[in-house]
A protein has these predicted regions:
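Small-residue-enriched hydrophobic alpha-helices in membranes
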Residues: 2-38, 43-204
């Protein structure tokens, strides 16, 4: 449940809310999980490190919370299930999963091992398995569509399905969230498309 000051200042779903408006403990836990995904493979890719550093700045964490996030990269013991259960009680669940998938995709490849790792997190966050699959297909499709002048109908279908899910689950996108990590231009297009999608459905 959101703190009173957060609940009263919520903007429309079609806008991009600032993550820094949320309690710092939520933001710390959020980025600790992102860091865990970044090091879920044997080697931390430079693009993953760059993305994590950028997000740490955008999340405006207190100094000790920043240290806690970067400590995860050094394989400091992390009670991940406990953190996931805490975050499962917030409204950040689906936004977090999008960012976790974005981090996993930061090196340009989403490996089966990473998908398995993400699925385990999704279970503790109490994300429906069908919803998880829709988001995975969305991440794949956005990456592929960004490389085409005329995206295939299947990719368009997967993007539309994800938008419908996000609307149904009241997902709020943040400016830092990358809907397409491989292309800043297409990422912006998707965010604009999302806002039009929300506006169109709100007017029905």
């Amino acid at each position: 449940m959101l703190p009173t000051n957060m609940a009263t200042n919520m903007t429309d779903m079609g806008t991009l809310t600032e993550i820094s408006d949320y309690p710092w403990r939520w933001r710390r836990d959020y980025l600790m999980l992102v860091a865990a995904v970044a090091v879920s493979e044997e080697e931390l890719h430079p693009d993953e490190m760059e993305l994590l550093k950028r997000w740490v700045e955008q999340f405006r964490l207190p100094p000790k919370s920043r240290e806690a996030v970067f400590a995860v990269l050094k394989n400091k013991p992390l009670d991940r299930p406990r953190i996931e259960r805490r975050l499962s009680r917030t409204d950040l669940v689906y936004s977090l999963m999008l960012d976790l998938m974005g981090m996993a995709m930061a090196d340009g490849i989403l490996m089966d091992k990473e998908i398995h790792f993400l699925r385990g997190i999704a279970e503790n966050l109490e994300i429906d398995p069908i919803d998880f699959n829709i988001l995975i297909e969305f991440i794949h499709s956005a990456h592929q569509a960004a490389q085409m002048d005329n995206p295939e109908p299947l990719y368009e279908h997967n993007i539309e399905s994800a938008f419908q899910l996000m609307l149904k689950r009241n997902v709020r996108l943040f400016p830092h969230t990358l809907l397409c990590v491989s292309s800043p231009e297409y990422d912006l297009q998707l965010k604009e498309r999302w806002m039009r999608f929300v506006a169109r459905n709100n007017n029905r």
